[in-house]
Amino acid sequence: MAMSPAATVARRRLAAASQGSHEGGARTWKILSFVLALPGVGVCMANAYMKMQAHSHDPPEFVPYPHLRIRTKPWPWGDGNHSLFHNAHTNALPTGYEGPHH
């Protein structure tokens, strides 16, 4: 099966490229990092910042579902109602959220 002249030329160039040295590899990745990666990170940071500014920071309305926040016995630390990793800004108690949020 004969190859077309264009396919033969392309095959020779690709074969020659694989035989060549790796001198420009680090330079290529350095250019790609500065031209693509850093601006990409900047765009992602700007997107996250704009979404944070548009986001409502009020907690959702508390609904006391009976299957959540069940306390059959108190926790062995503190007042017994707060888990070890309790966060007053995000975690609700069985009676609702604690105090005002900022």
UniProtKB/Swiss-Prot annotation:
Disordered: annotated span: 1-25
Ranges per topology, Mitochondrial intermembrane: 51-102
Main location: mitochondrion
Pathway: Energy metabolism; oxidative phosphorylation
Residue intervals annotated with topology Mitochondrial matrix: 15-25
PROSITE patterns the UniProt entry points to: COX6A (PS01329)
Ranges annotated as spanning the membrane: 26-50
UniProt family annotation: Belongs to the cytochrome c oxidase subunit 6A family.
Function: Component of the cytochrome c oxidase, the last enzyme in the mitochondrial electron transport chain which drives oxidative phosphorylation. The respiratory chain contains 3 multisubunit complexes succinate dehydrogenase (complex II, CII), ubiquinol-cytochrome c oxidoreductase (cytochrome b-c1 complex, complex III, CIII) and cytochrome c oxidase (complex IV, CIV), that cooperate to transfer electrons derived from NADH and succinate to molecular oxygen, creating an electrochemical gradient over the inner membrane that drives transmembrane transport and the ATP synthase.
Protein name: Cytochrome c oxidase subunit 6A, mitochondrial
Gene source species: Cyprinus carpio
